[in-house]
C-alpha cells in the first residue's frame, strides 16, 4: 500500500530528541490524575490564593463528587454541564464528570439564560455543576429543559484564612439554597460516596466544548478521551513543559480549550503545580508569579499587552519564568520585543481551535518565529488549499488552513450536515477546514492571515485586518487596535481603525493616518480612525471584532 503523503518541509526544525508522532496510553484522561496521585501524593496540585490541595486530596475529592454524580443518575455517555470561573471546584468537577464515565460540556460563565438554553437543550444535559453567583443565569432552565439538578459551588469554601489577595466575589460566603433541585457542593462531597468501576474507554467521548457561534448557533465539538489525552501529552512534551517541577500560572479561562488543555490537563498529566487565577488581573498575575516562582505561563496577546503596560510591573519579580506561550492572535512585534528585553524569553506562539481541542501547530522552541503559528505538531498533517476549488496551494500562497491529526474532533454533536461541511478529503485523509486563511513558508512554518469571512474588499483590493493591526502596533502610542470595514461611497468598503491610546498620548487620528501611509500600501491605510477607552473582549480575552463590525454596519 502506498503511504499517504504528508508535508515534511518543517521536519528539519523539529524539536531535538522528540518523535514526529506520539503513542498515547490506552486509558482515559482520568488515569493521568490517578497516576500523578500515586507518584506524587503529597505534592501540591492546586494553589488557590492561600489554599493548597495535594494530588492525593485532589483525587479524593474527584472520587467523592463522581460518586455523588452517579447517585444522581449520571451514566456512561451522559453530558454534564460545567459552568464556573477558574477555581479548584472547576478542576475537581471536570475530572469527576469523567470519572463518572460522562462527558464534560464546559460553558462560558458569561453566558446569559437564553444563550445557556441552547447549550442545555442541544447537549441534553440533565445535571449541571455551577457556582452560586451564576445561579440567576442557569437556574431558570430547571423545569424548562431536561436540566433537573444543579450542584452549586461556593468559591470561598476553598479559601484559607490568609487570602488577602482574593477579590470580594471569591470571598462571598455560601448562600442558602431554597430549591430541592439545588445541591450545595459541600453537601455533595460530604455524602462520602464512591464511584463504581469505570466503564469509559479511550474511544468514549470525554469533552464537548461548544464553538463560539461565529457562523450560526454554537455547535458541540465531540472529542474522545484519546484526542484529549493526545493534546495533553503534546503540551507536556513539545517545549519541555512536562516536568513535575513546573509551576504553572492559570490565567486563561478553564472553559476554553487552551486553558483547559495547555494549563490544566497538561499540568495534571505531568504532576506539576497549578496556580489558579479566577479572572484576569495584571497585578494579581504579577504577585502570583513573584510569590510562587511561576515557571510556565500560557496567555494570549491581550493579556501580555496589559501585563507589560502595567506601571507597577517593576514591583514584581518575574525572573522565575522559563516559558511564556500563547495564541489566539499574533503577538505584536513590539510587545514580543519588550518581553524579550525584560525577561530574555521569546513568546512561543501556537495555533488551535475548539475543533482540535487546542493546539495543532506550535513554534519549536529552538526555532521561534514571531507572528507565526508554528509548525504542525506531533502526528499532524496540515495543508493550505484554495477555499473554492479545494486545490492544494504551494508555499507562500494564501488559502484556507486545513488540519488532519489525532486531536481533530469526531464531528459536531447532532449535526451531520455541519460535520460534512467541516471536512474535506485529500490524499485519502480527512482534513478539518479551519475557516482561517493563511500560508506556509518555504520551511513549513504556518502564518495566519485572517478569518475567511473577515476580509475587507477596498476597490477590489483584499485587505486582511490582522495584517494591518500588526503594523499599527508598531506605533509607540497605540496600546490596542482593531481593524474593521466601514462603508465608502467610492471604494465600497474601506479600512477603519478603532484605537486605544497609551496613557498620556495626545495622538490625533490624522497624524496616525499620516504615519500609517509610511508603513503600508496605500489601500491598507486606515481612512477612518476612532479612539475608545477600551476594546470589547470575550471571556477568553480576545478582541470582539465582530461586535465592532456589526455596530459599524448598523450606523
Segments predicted by a language model, with ranges:
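Conserved AMP-binding/adenylate-forming
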Residues: 47-55, 61, 66-114, 121, ...
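Conserved AMP-binding A3 loop
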Residues: 54-56, 206-230
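Structural core segment of the AMP-binding/adenylate-forming
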Residues: 71-72, 99-187, 503-505
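AMP-binding/adenylate-forming catalytic core of the ANL superfamily
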Residues: 111, 128-130, 297, 405, ...
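Conserved pre-ATP/AMP-binding loop-to-beta segment of ANL
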Residues: 175-210, 217, 241-247
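Conserved AMP-binding/adenylation subdomain of ANL enzymes
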Residues: 229-247, 255-296, 304, 310
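Gly/Ser/Thr-rich phosphate-binding loop
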Residues: 291-299, 308-369, 381
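Conserved ATP/PPi-binding loop(s) of AMP-dependent carboxylate-activating enzymes
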Residues: 375-379, 391-423, 463
Amino acid at each position: 500500500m502506498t503511504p499517504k503523503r504528508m508535508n515534511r518541509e518543517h521536519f528539519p526544525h523539529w524539536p531535538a530528541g522528540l518523535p514526529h508522532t506520539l503513542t498515547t496510553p490506552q486509558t482515559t484522561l482520568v488515569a493521568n490524575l490517578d497516576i500523578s496521585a500515586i507518584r506524587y501524593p503529597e505534592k501540591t496540585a492546586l494553589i488557590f490564593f492561600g489554599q493548597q490541595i495535594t494530588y492525593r486530596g485532589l483525587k479524593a475529592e474527584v472520587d467523592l463528587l463522581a460518586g455523588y454524580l452517579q447517585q444522581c443518575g449520571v451514566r456512561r455517555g451522559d453530558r454534564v454541564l460545567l459552568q464556573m470561573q477558574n477555581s479548584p471546584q472547576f478542576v475537581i468537577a471536570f475530572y469527576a464528570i469523567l470519572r463518572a464515565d460522562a462527558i464534560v460540556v464546559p460553558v462560558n460563565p458569561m453566558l446569559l439564560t437564553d444563550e445557556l438554553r441552547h447549550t442545555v437543550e442541544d447537549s441534553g444535559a440533565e445535571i449541571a455543576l455551577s457556582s452560586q453567583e451564576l445561579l440567576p443565569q442557569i437556574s431558570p432552565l430547571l423545569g424548562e429543559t431536561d436540566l433537573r439538578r444543579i450542584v452549586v459551588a461556593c468559591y470561598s469554601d476553598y479559601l484559607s484564612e490568609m487570602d488577602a489577595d482574593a477579590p470580594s466575589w471569591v470571598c462571598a460566603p455560601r448562600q442558602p439554597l431554597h430549591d430541592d433541585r439545588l445541591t450545595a457542593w459541600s453537601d455533595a462531597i460530604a455524602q462520602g460516596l464512591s464511584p463504581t468501576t469505570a466503564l469509559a474507554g479511550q474511544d468514549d467521548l470525554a469533552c464537548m466544548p461548544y464553538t463560539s457561534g461565529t457562523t450560526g448557533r454554537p455547535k458541540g465539538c465531540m472529542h474522545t478521551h484519546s484526542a484529549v489525552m493526545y493534546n495533553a501529552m503534546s503540551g507536556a512534551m513539545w517545549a519541555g513543559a512536562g516536568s513535575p517541577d513546573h509551576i504553572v500560572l492559570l490565567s486563561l479561562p478553564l472553559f476554553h480549550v487552551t486553558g483547559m488543555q495547555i494549563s490544566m490537563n497538561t499540568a495534571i498529566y505531568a504532576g506539576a503545580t497549578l496556580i489558579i487565577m479566577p479572572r484576569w488581573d495584571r497585578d494579581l498575575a504579577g504577585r502570583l508569579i513573584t510569590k510562587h516562582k511561576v515557571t510556565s505561563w500560557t496567555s494570549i496577546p491581550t493579556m501580555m499587552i496589559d501585563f507589560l503596560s502595567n506601571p507597577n510591573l517593576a514591583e514584581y519579580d518575574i525572573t522565575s519564568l522559563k516559558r511564556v506561550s500563547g495564541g489566539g492572535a499574533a503577538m505584536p512585534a513590539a510587545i514580543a520585543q519588550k518581553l524579550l528585553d525584560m525577561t530574555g524569553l521569546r513568546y512561543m506562539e501556537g495555533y488551535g481551535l475548539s475543533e482540535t481541542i487546542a493546539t495543532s501547530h506550535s513554534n519549536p522552541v529552538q526555532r521561534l518565529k514571531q507572528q507565526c503559528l508554528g509548525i504542525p505538531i506531533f502526528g499532524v498533517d496540515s495543508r493550505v488549499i484554495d477555499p473554492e476549488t479545494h486545490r492544494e496551494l504551494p508555499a507562500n500562497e494564501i488559502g484556507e488552513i486545513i488540519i488532519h491529526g489525532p486531536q481533530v474532533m469526531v464531528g459536531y454533536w447532532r449535526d451531520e450536515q455541519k460535520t460534512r461541511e467541516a471536512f474535506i478529503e485529500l490524499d485519502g485523509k480527512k482534513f478539518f477546514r479551519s475557516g482561517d486563511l493563511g500560508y506556509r513558508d518555504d520551511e513549513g512554518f504556518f502564518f495566519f492571515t485572517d478569518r475567511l469571512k473577515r476580509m475587507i474588499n477596498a476597490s477590489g483590493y483584499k485587505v486582511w485586518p490582522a495584517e494591518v493591526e500588526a503594523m499599527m502596533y508598531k506605533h509607540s502610542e497605540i496600546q490596542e487596535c482593531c481593524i474593521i470595514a466601514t462603508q465608502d461611497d467610492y471604494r465600497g468598503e474601506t479600512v477603519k481603525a478603532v484605537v486605544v491610546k497609551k496613557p498620556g498620548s495626545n495622538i490625533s487620528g490624522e497624524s496616525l493616518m499620516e504615519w500609517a501611509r509610511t508603513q503600508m500600501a496605500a489601500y491598507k491605510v486606515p481612512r477612518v480612525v476612532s479612539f475608545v477607552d477600551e476594546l470589547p473582549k470575550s471571556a477568553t480575552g480576545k478582541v470582539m471584532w465582530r461586535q465592532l463590525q456589526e455596530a459599524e454596519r448598523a450606523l
